[in-house]
């Protein structure tokens, strides 16, 4: 291959997609491709998102924008996997690749440049690629080619940024059948990665600049159910204490109905685990949740929150909710609002319902008009803003560990970063005044001021206690 071959990788969507993009980057670099951010690259690969309508539109807009230049455009990721040939027909400007093409991505791009792009795939339900019985899946998964699941002594990953925070995939797919969600159809059945592979990748990430690792999957509380160990996630989290160079690990995508006491204990109390619970409540009305084919309701969720805070009153809780689900009444919306006020969550994402192709809910009657959905979203988002701001104010005076990510653009004498109760990209940030710490440093500080959900903090002098994995805290 000529040395001049260049490729631009554009990442859209969630942290799981970021992991997949870094696998693609590693494969391309291994094959001699040079990564660039220039729009004039020989090929632009867009790692698309296909989750909800807004994300799909962003992916399409990004593909069209890239196609305006001289570069060849290739679509990978969830939108490409989900729609395949139909997307190719609608968008002849781009070559559409499947997850199955990832192991041979370099050859596929060579074919595109040579004028022989591969024929687009016909989408299939990827749940059918693995056995129905979970314990039979890990061995079969090696033959399927699941993105981000490679094992072996060498980590196939190339970091695309120098952030001190890095995502790490512990599982893929989902066995739940939520009526609003299409993800299992194109991400497949749930399958866990072996703990040894995860820990090897964690050490590699730490060796390449990561100080905090964020564990991602479609459903992290199911981790290990196919490995024959109901406490596999608890053991995995404990094992991260032995990864040299890490200051903390954060676990995301927890299903409330699957959260167990032992898991609460390790997340709430282990010194190297962020006391942070990312719980996908989705709603609070039991009636709406049943139609979503989910479990629980206000009472069960509040009991779970009480148990978390009994173990660690400082623990942070984040969740997402869907407003405007078919059949949702004004009483259901009121119950959701009351729940959010009582729950005192640290972070809340509010989404308006939209029909997704192939989902059960898309065929439900009693659809809510779009204008009414927007109105309900505005109402719940207003409550969410009040609740999260109140929760942030309650942290005034707390001592936290701030992982420094950079220098504040508005204040050269200040740094910004994230505490143990703030996840990068989805929660607020902490601005640390009078700070000269380097990126990746962990600084003990006191929260002295609140701005919405953001913290202003001051370093605590003379404090260096309590850091995991041999790391130091500056103060």
From Swiss-Prot:
GO annotation (BP), single: tRNA modification
Domain Radical SAM core: 160-390
Keyword S-adenosyl-L-methionine recorded: yes
Superkingdom in the source lineage: Bacteria
Record text on cofactor binding: Binds 2 [4Fe-4S] clusters. One cluster is coordinated with 3 cysteines and an exchangeable S-adenosyl-L-methionine.
Disulfide partners: none
Co-factor(s): [4Fe-4S] cluster
Enzyme Commission number(s) of this protein: 2.8.4.4
Described function: Catalyzes the methylthiolation of an aspartic acid residue of ribosomal protein uS12.
Descriptive protein name: Ribosomal protein uS12 methylthiotransferase RimO
Source organism: Acidothermus cellulolyticus (strain ATCC 43068 / DSM 8971 / 11B)
């Amino acid at each position: 291959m000529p040395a001049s071959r260049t490729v631009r990788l554009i990442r859209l969507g969630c942290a799981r997609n970021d992991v997949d993009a870094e696998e693609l980057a590693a494969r391309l670099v291994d094959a001699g491709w040079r990564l660039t951010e220039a729009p004039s690259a020989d090929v632009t690969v867009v790692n698309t998102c296909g989750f909800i309508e807004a994300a799909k539109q962003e992916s399409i807009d990004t593909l069209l924008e890239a196609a305006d230049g001289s570069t060849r455009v290739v679509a990978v990721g969830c939108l490409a996997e989900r729609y395949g040939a139909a997307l190719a027909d609608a968008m002849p400007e781009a070559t559409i690749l499947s997850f199955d093409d990832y192991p041979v991505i370099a050859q596929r791009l060579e074919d595109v440049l040579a004028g022989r792009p591969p024929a687009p795939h016909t989408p299939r339900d990827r749940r059918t690629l693995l056995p129905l019985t979970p314990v039979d899946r890990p061995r079969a998964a090696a033959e399927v080619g699941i993105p981000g699941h490679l094992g072996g002594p060498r980590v196939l990953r190339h970091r695309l940024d120098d952030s001190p925070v890095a995502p790490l995939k512990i599982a893929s797919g989902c066995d739940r059948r939520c009526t609003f969600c299409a993800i299992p159809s194109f991400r497949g059945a749930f399958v866990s990665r072996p703990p040894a592979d995860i820990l090897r990748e964690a050490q590699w990430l730490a060796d390449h600049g990561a100080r905090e690792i964020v564990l991602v999957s479609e459903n992290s509380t199911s981790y290990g159910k196919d490995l024959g160990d109901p406490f596999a996630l608890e053991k995995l989290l404990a094992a991260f204490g032995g990864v040299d160079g890490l200051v903390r690990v954060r676990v995301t995508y927890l299903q409330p109905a699957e959260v167990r006491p032992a898991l609460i204990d390790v997340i709430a109390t282990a010194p190297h685990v962020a006391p942070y619970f990312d719980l996908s409540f989705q709603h609070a009305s039991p009636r709406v949740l049943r139609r979503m084919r989910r479990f629980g309701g206000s009472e069960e969720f509040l009991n779970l929150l009480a148990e978390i805070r009994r173990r660690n009153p400082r623990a942070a809780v984040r969740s997402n909710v869907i407003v405007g689900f078919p059949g949702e009444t004004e009483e259901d919306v009121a119950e959701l609002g009351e729940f959010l006020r009582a729950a005192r969550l640290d972070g809340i994402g509010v989404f308006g319902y939209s029909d997704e192709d192939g989902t059960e809910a898309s065929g439900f009657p009693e659809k809510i008009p779009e204008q009414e959905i927007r109105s309900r979203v505005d109402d719940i988002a207003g409550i969410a803003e009040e609740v999260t701001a109140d929760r942030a104010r309650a942290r005034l005076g707390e001592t936290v560990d701030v992982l420094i990510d950079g220098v504040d653009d508005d204040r050269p004498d200040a740094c910004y970063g994230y505490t143990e109760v703030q996840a990068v990209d989805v929660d607020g940030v902490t601005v640390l005044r009078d700070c000269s710490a380097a990126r990746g440093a962990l600084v003990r500080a006191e929260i002295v001021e609140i701005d919405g959900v953001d913290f202003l903090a001051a370093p605590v002098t003379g404090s260096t206690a309590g850091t995991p994995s041999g790391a130091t805290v500056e103060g």
